[in-house]
């Protein structure tokens, strides 16, 4: 059987406060592992993964950035050319949720693609002490025209779905990416039926 052609390479960013689990989400998605002692990212981490969504094989270049202020000088080059962004907060930390507006402002300032697809992820739903409700996350996502999902890098709940939904929406956005492939497949159905935790709120 012939190897399926990769139709495009997409640049995906993961942003949010330090400690919300950005690196853990990336590690779970790319390597299906979880390290409870995951150290804070210094600067930028970068991983590549191939993903097939709706019959389209894409290569994802996923950038994970440090949430700390002292690394913010990396910002302009980090955002340049990105087609998708995953904005992460910790459902057990109201403070991380309250900082989302600042991250969105930075995204608007530095992103070079105005139609970039945004996904809001409420991480660490395995924890008992939730400070942010699902409704609060959904309301914020709707207000800012973002996809939304709650997830847990620890249990792997919602992680695959988050990346698949993001990539599917990018593929369905004309002009956001380029392809030389003739194998593009477009579908017009939404994310219904892919599990209770996934919401498309655009």
Curated annotation (Swiss-Prot):
A lipid is attached at residues 198, 200 (S-geranylgeranyl cysteine). GO terms for cellular component: plasma membrane. It is found in: Cell membrane. PROSITE patterns: RAB. Its EC number is 3.6.5.2. GO terms for biological process: protein transport. It is a lipid-anchor. Keywords: Cell membrane, GTP-binding, Hydrolase, Lipoprotein, Membrane, Nucleotide-binding, Prenylation, Protein transport, Transport. GO terms for molecular function: GTP binding; GTPase activity. Belongs to the small GTPase superfamily. Rab family. This is Ras-related protein Rab-18. It comes from Lymnaea stagnalis (Great pond snail). The lineage of its organism: Eukaryota, Metazoa, Spiralia, Lophotrochozoa, Mollusca. The gene is RAB18A.
């Amino acid at each position: 059987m012939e190897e399926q052609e990769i139709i495009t390479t997409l640049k995906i960013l993961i942003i949010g406060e330090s400690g919300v689990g950005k690196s853990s989400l990336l590690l779970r998605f790319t390597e299906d592992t979880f390290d409870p002692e995951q150290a804070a990212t210094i600067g930028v981490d970068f991983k590549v993964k191939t993903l097939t969504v709706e019959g389209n094989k894409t290569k994802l270049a996923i950038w994970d950035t440090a949430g700390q202020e002292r690394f913010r000088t990396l910002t302009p080059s980090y955002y340049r050319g990105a087609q998708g962004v995953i904005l992460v907060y910790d459902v057990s930390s109201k403070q991380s949720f309250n900082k989302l507006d600042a991250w969105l402002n930075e995204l608007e300032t530095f992103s070079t693609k105005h139609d970039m697809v945004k996904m809001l992820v409420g991480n660490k739903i395995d924890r008992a002490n939730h400070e942010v409700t699902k409704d609060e996350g959904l309301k914020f996502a709707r207000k800012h025209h973002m996809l939304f999902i709650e997830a847990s890098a620890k249990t792997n709940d919602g992680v695959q779905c988050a990346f698949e939904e993001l990539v599917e929406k990018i593929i369905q956005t004309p002009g956001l990416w380029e392809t030389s492939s003739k194998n593009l497949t477009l579908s017009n159905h939404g994310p219904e039926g892919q599990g209770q935790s996934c919401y498309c709120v655009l």
